[in-house]
Amino acid sequence: MKTYLVTGCAGFIGSNFVHYMLEKYEDIRLVNLDKLTYAGNLENLQDIEDDARHIFVQGDICDKALVTDLIAKYDPDYVINFAAESHVDRSIKNPEIFVESNVLGTVNLLQCCKDAWYDAAAKTWKEGKKYLQVSTDEVYGALGAEGYFMETTPLCPHSPYSASKASADMFVKAFHDTYGMPMNITRCSNNYGPYQFPEKLIPLLINNAKQHKTLPVYGDGMQIRDGLYVMDHCKAIDMVANGGKDGEVYNVGGHNERPNIFIVKTVIAQLHDRLKDEGISEELITHVADRLGHDRRYGIDPTKIKEDLGWYPETPFEKGIVLTIDWYLAHPDWMAHVTSGDYQKYYEQMYKNK
């Protein structure tokens, strides 16, 4: 039986990964660590809380004693780090929080893994161990009208968020280059799907449109993103963990490039038709001042992961957006719970008077 220590398990991608793995594998143990900050939600794991293969621990990846104890107690074969502050707008207002979680937290995980897995005298690592860092295409910066990010593209982050993720990636590489730590890094394009906190575009649109609230769009809305359905991403992480070549970086993209304004109008049309609600229309769109340092285009070349591991994105945007909207419409209580209290204060801070 393989054991995974999964950090950030109650967040968007982490919780989807936990569901994916438990559905795919019978003989598995997932030790799931999450601090349960604003975007970490135990409701994301509610349907598996009685599954004996799933062990939840509330805690901080910066807590060296806790992480050390978990590795010693459960002896994980893989440590997969999803834990991160991930919203660019928040990073612009509070960059220090992103340094603590994304950089120092990653370094602590690496050091704890090294302490448990590395024999310094023999300069050898325990067999069958691997650290996997889940990263983002934003570490590469922005693209022009043509071309794609490749694993060899230089890192050129533009926001405090992407700078923190790039720094974490470099520490993972440094532990591999310095100590020989077995590791992989995955860099994904923009994920969407169930359990995504509504500070991100698609769930924000769904939540606002249902209430006939304005739909804020940064600038002209022509920023291009490569949409990746979250379960396709989970499959890629599983394949990299179990088959990725040691020390390699793998780009994970959906080949679903769309301008933000196209996504906005698609969500409006879907909700209008589904709910038969004349109040949901493009008149709700409100263009707001563009984000500082807003990257114009992202696009990933996933050739390497296809050739090395046989992964490919199975979900076109036209299917994925329907699955996503269906999920949010079927889970109104989830949305109501996560948008209460502090979320309203955050929303007003981000979009009021823009």
PLM regions: where:
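The catalytic Tyr-centered alpha-helix of NAD(P)H-dependent dehydrogenases
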Residues: 146, 157-164, 194, 198, ...
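C-terminal substrate-binding subdomain of Rossmann-fold SDR/epimerase-dehydratase oxidoreductases
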Residues: 4, 17, 24, 30, ...
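Residue-level signature of the cytosolic catalytic core of signaling kinases
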Residues: 41, 145, 194-198, 256, ...
